[in-house]
Amino acid sequence: MFSTKVFAITRRAALTAACATVLSSGAFAQSGAPLRTGVDATFAPHAMVKLEGGLQGFNIDLGEELAKRLGRKITIEGTEFSGLVPGLNAKKYDFVLAPVTVTPERAKAMLFTEGYLDTDYTFVIKKGSPAITSLNDLKGKTIAVNKGSAYENWTRDNAAKFDFKYDVYGNNADAVQAVQSGRADANLAGNTVAAWAAKQNPSVQTTYTVKTGLVWALAFRLDDKAGRDAAGNALKCMKLDGTVGKLATKWFGFTPGADAAAVKVAAGQGVEGLDGYDTTPFKPVCAKT
């Protein structure tokens, strides 16, 4: 397990007042204790270990900014992705900061904020290997995926249909290594992670992308609507002032469009059309800067 990093955030009275309407109960109302959350610290560029110690990445910056706007301290722990949801349910974590793909199944088990990034699925192959131009090209291949991720679910659901095998790994870095070593023909990961892997590893390259229409969002326990709504308010404000878009440009090298999840603000709280979505029109309360 990676070392825990605590970010001390100075409380600002204006922000506290701005969030007062949504901080009514649960962990988010306990101002004396830091928010506790976790990430897969091998899931670059969303979260990764710095050489000098500590964590960095898109989701680390997102978590720091979220805590700042809530006037809270935050503890971000690095662990395997498969341990994050059990940790949330055991109340080890107040929410999951790691990218969690929102699916109908997951929306029945957790409360989500609105999405902060769109997530498509991209294959990574060894450089020089034949490109994957359609899902039919997966026949006879072995796909490496991160255990407990949406990519494992996708490969499990589609392996028989497209006649491929899949292996699961404790983290995505090991899945990419399986491609580099020839133990797997391709790795399936989110589009941002796949692009980063190819950028950092000249021996691999990206290929076919599966369009999903899915988003990444912050995950909370079903009984913590107050926490979800507090974080949701802050996230909406971060979209409105361009913070999420700037973080995407910093870490992924692209500027999200007007309809991208990093920019578009939902009318209610949660992911529209799925369980847990609150259709009540929600006007974010943002502190003046």
For each predicted feature, which ranges?
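Immediate post-signal peptide segment of exported/extracytoplasmic ligand-binding proteins
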Residues: 27-55, 130-132, 136-142, 271-289
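Extracytoplasmic small-molecule ligand-binding "clamshell" domains
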Residues: 30-99
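Beta->alpha turn/N-cap motifs
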Residues: 38-43, 77-82, 91-103, 119, ...
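Periplasmic-binding protein-like
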Residues: 41, 117-125, 195-235, 254-276, ...
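Short helix-initiation/N-cap motifs at beta->coil->alpha
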Residues: 60, 75-86, 130, 166-181, ...
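Extended ligand-binding regions for polar small-molecule ligands
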Residues: 60-69, 129, 136, 142, ...
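A conserved helix-loop-strand patch within extracytoplasmic ligand-binding domains
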Residues: 72, 100-102, 114-164
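A ligand-binding cleft/hinge motif common to bilobed small-molecule-binding domains
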Residues: 83-86, 98-108, 156-157, 178-212
